[in-house]
Amino acid sequence: MIVIFVGLAGVLGALMRFGLDSFFAQRGRFAHGQAHHFPLATLSVNVLGSFIIGLAGGFASHAELSPDWHSAISIGIAGGLTTFSSFAVATVSLWQLGNKFSAMVNIGLNLVLGLGAAWLGLSLAA
């Protein structure tokens, strides 16, 4: 049963990611597939996912969240939402297009904001 629960949560995470990608694409600033633009949608889903998994981990460490719910949220929702591969491809594409500064900023922001969001989630759940 947990497998189905995690799978359904993964669908929710993927739909959340699609929604955020669509939000940025509709504004015309970061159109899908245009690597020369800063990948703000990818940054957003990775930071949000880091916060969600931090929050879930914090609640699970205090036994306020069952292992099944922790798996559904961490593996399903956060796993379906976040994307390391898109981050990697966008960063390499920026670099190859000569936008080395943007590529480095993307790496820095994903690390700093992602770690900060995970810390915030863990702290709020404490």
UniProtKB/Swiss-Prot annotation:
GO terms for biological process: cellular detoxification of fluoride. Coiled coil: none annotated. It is found in: Cell membrane. InterPro entries: FluC (IPR003691). Fluoride-specific ion channel. Important for reducing fluoride concentration in the cell, thus reducing its toxicity. Belongs to the fluoride channel Fluc/FEX (TC 1.A.43) family. This is Fluoride-specific ion channel FluC. Its main location: membrane. The keyword Protein biosynthesis does not apply. GO terms for molecular function: fluoride channel activity; metal ion binding. The keyword Transmembrane applies. Na(+) is not transported, but it plays an essential structural role and its presence is essential for fluoride channel function. It catalyses: fluoride(in) = fluoride(out). Keywords: Cell membrane, Ion channel, Ion transport, Membrane, Metal-binding, Sodium, Transmembrane, Transmembrane helix, Transport. Na(+) binds at residues 79, 82. It is a multi-pass membrane protein. GO terms for cellular component: plasma membrane. It comes from the Bacteria. Pfam families: CRCB. The chain crosses the membrane at residues 1-21, 40-60, 72-92, 104-124.
